[in-house]
Regions:
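Catalytic helix-loop patch of NAD(P)-dependent Rossmann-fold dehydrogenases
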Residues: 3-46, 53, 57-59
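Amphipathic terminal alpha-helices
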Residues: 171-187
Length: 187
C-alpha cells in the first residue's frame, strides 16, 4: 500500500505509489492479472497477504530469524525504535483464504486482502518470542530501512464477504505454535 496512511488498508485504496521494489512488483503483477482477465476472460483473484508467519517460515524473515538469534544468545536487529506495527497472519489462516479464493467464482477479477486485521508492535512481538523461548532478547538498534512502512493493517471486510474468510489464530497462539515447531526442527 506504499505511502498510504489510511488504516486499515482497503483493497480500494490507491497502490500507485509503492515505496519498495517488492511493493512495485506486487502492484505490477495485479495490473498484469487485470489486463489478462479483461482481454482473455481469465478468472483471477489476486491475494494481498499481510506478514505471514508460522512453521517452516523462511529463516531470513523476522520471526524465524529472531527466534534463532535469541536461542543462540545473539542480538536481534531492530530497525528504528521498535514501534513499527505489522498485521501478522498465521499460515493456516492464509491457507484457508487461498483455498476459498480458488473456489471463488463471483466475478472475473478481484483483489482481496488476507490478514488477521490486528496490528502488533515490534516490541510486543519480541516480548512474545522471549516469553515462549523463555530467553531474553538482546537488541541491536539500527536505523530504519529504506522502503519500510510504519505499519501494515488489513481490512478483511471483502475477504469475509466474498470468501467467508475468518482468521482463527491470534498472534499469541501463533507464536506459541511457531516456537514449538522451531524447537522440534532445531533439535
Amino acid at each position: 500500500y506504499g505511502i498510504n496512511s489510511r488504516v486499515p488498508f482497503s483493497e480500494d485504496d490507491p497502490v500507485a505509489q509503492p515505496i519498495s521494489p517488492y511493493a512495485a512488483t506486487k502492484a505490477a503483477g495485479e495490473l498484469l492479472c487485470h489486463t489478462y482477465s479483461h482481454l482473455f476472460g481469465f478468472r483471477t483473484v489476486c491475494l494481498r497477504f499481510f506478514t505471514v508467519y508460522g512453521p517452516r517460515q523462511r529463516p531470513d524473515l523476522a520471526i524465524h530469524k529472531f527466534a534463532r538469534l535469541i536461542s543462540e544468545g545473539k542480538p536481534i536487529p531492530v530497525f528504528g525504535d521498535g514501534t513499527t506495527r505489522r498485521d501478522y497472519t498465521y499460515v493456516d489462516d492464509i491457507i484457508a483464504g487461498v483455498r476459498a479464493a480458488i473456489d471463488y467464482d463471483g466475478s472475473d477479477y478481484e483483489v482481496i486482502n488476507l490478514g488477521e486485521s490486528r496490528t502488533v508492535e515490534l516490541r510486543e512481538l519480541i516480548t512474545l518470542l522471549e516469553k515462549e523461548l523463555d530467553l531474553p532478547a538482546q537488541i541491536d538498534r539500527q536505523p530504519l530501512q529504506p522502503g519500510d512502512v510504519p505499519q501494515t493493517f488489513a481490512d478483511i471486510t471483502k475477504a469475509r464477504r466474498l470468501l467467508g474468510y475468518d482468521p482463527q489464530t491470534q498472534i499469541e497462539s501463533g507464536i506459541k505454535q511457531f516456537v514449538a515447531w522451531f524447537r522440534n526442527s532445531s533439535a
